Amino acid sequence: MSHKERPTFYRQELNKTIWEVPERYQNLSPVGSGAYGSVCSALDTKSGLRVAVKKLSRPFQSMIHAKRTYRELRLLKHMKHENVIGLLDAFSPATCLAGFNDVYLVTHLMGADLNNIVKCQKLTDDHVQFLIYQILRGLKYIHSADIIHRDLKPSNLAVNEDCELKILDFGLARLTDDEMTGYVATRWYRAPEIMLNWMHYNMTVDIWSVGCIMAELLTGRTLFPGTDHINQLQQIMRLTGTPPASLISRMPSHEARNYINSLSYMPKRNFADVFVGANPMAVDLLEKMLVLDTDKRITASQALAHPYFAQYHDPDDEPEADPYDQSFESRDLDIEEWKRLTYEEVISFEPPVFDGDEMES
């Protein structure tokens, strides 16, 4: 594989899938599979760490698949931050572009996600501060690269025993309507403007999700468990009140404006009455996150400086990302072109320097 010393690969069948990986990865054990690939845990004999090896499923099956494969690889390669999942290795058993059909990505093996944590224990306010601080610290970094997560929810937040958190699966979500229909967690954390196509959305769709997650950590229950889009919006407005005229008039969608105007007026509730017993600083922050008007919603950077995080906030240790070139998003290339670009990204991958201080879960 060009300038890299090519390792020795070995083959093994797991769950009716052939895995072909470098010898440094041993003890492969299936941990799950989804639409876009299967994941095994493995021991990385080089670092001594348990890692997650993901084999992408039919990465170049269609133009959409091929572009998504390229997107995932580019995003993961770019992310170098303690609170964001990054890439430890990328490889393919192929020795040339002509034989390049499989892509494998290696990341840290994350133990629990925030869902497990919430179910198991009532969190103290200090726990909530630390967890939400880390989400916002990761988001500041992601947003500074002009990347929007779009699908932040408890299952996309990995947490280890020390309460250290990493954001997973960002920037990939281009969710279809079917995936958002019905009583689904995917939608419960979604900002109303993205769920209902109100208008062009911005980075703060992720802040809305953080507000929903933070409320859930404080109360132990889902904030807006809507049964469908309409019920979800009703639950949201019971808290936020109906959108002000100034916001409705800025919605490009005629349908959206008509629908909102047809709703009976609802006043905004006093958040202190809803989150009884919560730290007043936490309530104040929630009020700034769960705002219908995206122009008035707090940003990740601003939220980090909120007094609620006084014991964690350190402006010198909340880094931003290098610029991320995503001009490829507007390109319509054929499968072979996306494949060639992906191949180049795989062979040019430089593994991170292991500092011995990485989080194990």
UniProtKB/Swiss-Prot annotation:
Pfam families: Pkinase. It catalyses: L-seryl-[protein] + ATP = O-phospho-L-seryl-[protein] + ADP + H(+); L-threonyl-[protein] + ATP = O-phospho-L-threonyl-[protein] + ADP + H(+). Activated by threonine and tyrosine phosphorylation by the dual specificity kinase, MKK6. Gene3D superfamilies: Phosphorylase Kinase, domain 1, Transferase(Phosphotransferase) domain 1. Its cofactor is Mg(2+). The modification Phosphotyrosine is found at Y183. It is found in: Cytoplasm; Nucleus. Its EC number is 2.7.11.24. It comes from the Eukaryota. The keyword GTP-binding does not apply. One of its GO terms (biological process) is p38MAPK cascade. This is Mitogen-activated protein kinase 14B. The gene is mapk14b.
